[in-house]
Amino acid sequence: MAREHGSMRALVNSLAGLLGETDTEVPSLEPAMLMVLKSSISEFFLSTDTVSVDEAAELFPRLQFLACRAYAASHTPDAAMLAENLAGLVLWRIHQNWTDREMEAVDQMFVLLEIMNGESGVYMLSNNNLRISAKYGPSNMHLIVSTWLDTFRNVMSVAAKSTPDSLFNSKRMESIEEFSKPLVHAKFNLIYDMPFVQEGLRIVAKKINWILPFGLMVKGYKDMSMAPLTRALFLLSLVDSYFPKGTATEGSMKALTAYFRELVRTIDNSAFVPITEVNATPRTAYEVRVSSAIVHQNPYVTDTKAGMVAERVRTDAEILTSGALLSSGALSAHATAVAKLLSSNEPDDVSSRARARVAEHASNTWETIQASTTPTQVVEALVTAGFTSTHCGILERVVVDYFTRLRSTANSGPGRNDSLDYAQQVVGCVAIVGGVVFRLLLSYGFGLDYIRDYTTTISTLEPVYNELLSALGLADKGVEQTLKRSMAPRPYMNYISAARAALDDELLIVEKRTTGPGTHSAARESLLTWFDFRARDRWGVRIPDRDTTSTQVLAPITASLYSDDDLIAAASKLSFDALDAPPTQIIDDPSFAPYMLATVVLDAFNAILTSRFSADSVSQALRVLSWARDYGAGSIANVDGYRTKLTAIIASVSPFLQKDAPTPTMAHANNLEALLGELHSVVVAAIALIPERARMPVPERPSVKTSTFLAGLFLTAVYKRLETLVGHTAELTNNILGTASGIVSSIVTLNRFFNCRIMPVMGHYAVLIYPQSAQSAPFGRWRLVDVVDAVGSIYNEVSDLRADLRADVVTLKGDITSAAEALQECEALAVKTEGTRFGKLFNSLLTRHTQLARAQRGLAIRAGKLLGGSEAPGLKHVNTFLQRWGAISVMYQKATSGSTPEVNITSLANTLRHVWDEVQQERKATPPSRKFSNRDLGLAVERLMGGYPEVLDDDSNSTALTPKFNVDSWNSVNMDALRKRVTMPANIDSIRGNDSLATREYLKKEDLLAEIDAIFNNTK
């Protein structure tokens, strides 16, 4: 509500002005003052604002005193309901943030409860013949809320002690639901809907839910039936998620490192790539992290230092087929291997077997997910299979990237296949659903917060994944149905019904005990209207009355104690802030209801429609809306639900007057337009029942064309949405331009590098790189393997940049869809407001929407040129070069170290011949090389070879090894061994070893152990 103070303070001020706060005899109230009293109480009952604990503690004693005086002065149901149930009604409005210093916040609440149940308040109730045993009275609320607070304190104490360190070696871990269940026990049903309870449920979920995947990862690491590599990968996931460096304690880091070292030592050597092949293929950042940790036997080592040669964990297809290296039930624990398999399309037998095994593994996981009915079951199905939160993200990105590449390739040429294979489909299904499950798990609980998160997440699935879901073989709403079985909210809706029934019971009691004018209790109308609106707005439910009577509607005037002239005369006195009110007897007459709606509600309707969408104007309109809602609450029923509609409008508009007001959206605007349309129907129906001679003009149906308020609201919503779209597109444009610039720069660098003259240096396995002109000095001399490695690095850099660009383009296409929808809505609004002063503003926004859509499409087209085809433009021959080099390198390794050298040497010769023939064919069609300046070529060479050492230019082709060891000074060490071919000294048999080595005496293991034992025995 647009008030200087909140509703609680406003009620205190209003009652204090009417009744005074001195302990004197209660003054008698005139009818006008009685109406003000009832109106003030109804306004408090209908208010939707909140109050802080401190303010409630300050105001409660005063309000309790004034409520008792109000009952003594009026003996109305309104005052009785307020005085007897004030504790619960105030607690319902308490806003308590448990996030910071939970224990202090609990103590604050206990202080408030003691104030509510204080002796003076209880005495005042008893002294005025009011009950202290009301369901929402001080006694019952003190009992229920204090018990809940004690329970909450205990839960938070356990949560504070439940840390990764304390639970790592725990024999039993509590189910996440066991923490929240005590807080939603049936004895707390009356306070379940209260905001401080809902906030408590939210904070418990936030602090506890991590335990579920944590416990499953610990279980996977400790499972002795799993392969050592699988267990090590589980432990790495555990470290990354719950014991990261910087937050983990030193003790836990040492213990985890010791566990990890012991585990890694049991991994079979066949799980590693040989040293000679570690740089044969590029690695992802996560693969580097995994390999570095396992090779160094330390989970906190995340990379290998530059220049260091280290083993790496295999990620080829064959490792996925080995049951001895990877447990079949948790293949996805080795996410990098699965990702590499899914991102390729190799047709060989090993890859086919691996894809079949991965597909079977993921299919079993998918079936378990679909059969799961609780969060525990679905998370267990994911984590035990290796689909941790991190791994789901990795595999989802791989499938999305591969699908996007397929689509772009299919669009670039006819006859292309743009479908995913079965392994990619089923892994994609598990990864996407798993990612959503882990996101939902962060807030899963029995409260309102999880309902909001769940509905928001589900509603964004289709727009985010779009065509991918159908490509994965999922039916429409398939993901939603799968998640619904296990992750759907399970709120205690019967508690909401119980709370309403309790309010209804209290209203019946006070209505029987007191006598008020008319046939309708203002307290009943206002309180139940407030509760029903709250239930529908927050929980999305409509709770029927226990008597199941149909909604009251306006009926034709058939009989009345008063003539039409009397009713018309009384209605003419109805206006906002009017000093002269109609007689109470006429207001109580049911025949007066249409007149009241046709005047009071019509005034409020016109006030909001004609107000500008600004703080001052809307604030004034809200005052009129509140007056219309509260007027005649004790006399006129909530016919056609007009009070509920007014309450909904007030609640929808009020947030825009706050300091941290939300940005209005199209959903806000459409919702308010619909509410005003419903209110218009009520007003039109009321006007139709008034005699024609006194009938006021029927207002136009509210629309953006006829309402200044709606036009301003829609205009603001459209502008803010456009502003957001422009900002996001600008940010995305910068990313795309930066990525595209990097791709083009790398392509240009490689193009210039290969336009240099490259000459072999015989005997050194090196090449000289010259500028294009024959007379120029060379840029330098490098080993051939370093040149190939440098070219491969730049090529892989381009591939990574293209993957980033592809992801940005997918996001851009989503923005294009959003912009197109925004354009259509803006165009429709411009048409509706044509000819009005707002029409020009909407047309201006329409122009900006069109410009944005054009810019987005142009950006997508230009970025797509770098994504068409399997290679970046200009890199086809570079890829061919690297593939040929790789093929020759593999055959050379086999020929020099294989068990059947003759066969491998023949294969090497055939490979060389095939490559040579291809090169000769390509030379015939090679266009003339472009001319570049020496400076441009030099910069290209510097970028590629700047990090590699040059080969020295001297007469000798090789250097001999020296017997230098135990180095004290590097000055006498022959460093040429690092740059040249090595020649063995003549006195060393390089095949059978040095004969003198066989005649030497060596220290045996048994002798060494005996010496150690002797040392320890002598010290005893």
Swiss-Prot record:
GO terms for biological process: virion assembly. One of its GO terms (cellular component) is host cell nucleus. Residues 539-1020 are annotated as: Interaction with large tegument protein. The keyword Phosphoprotein does not apply. Keywords: Host cytoplasm, Host Golgi apparatus, Host nucleus, Virion, Virion tegument. The keyword Nucleus does not apply. Interacts (via C-terminus) with the large tegument protein/LTP (via N-terminus). This is Inner tegument protein. The lineage of its organism: Viruses, Duplodnaviria, Heunggongvirae, Peploviricota, Herviviricetes.
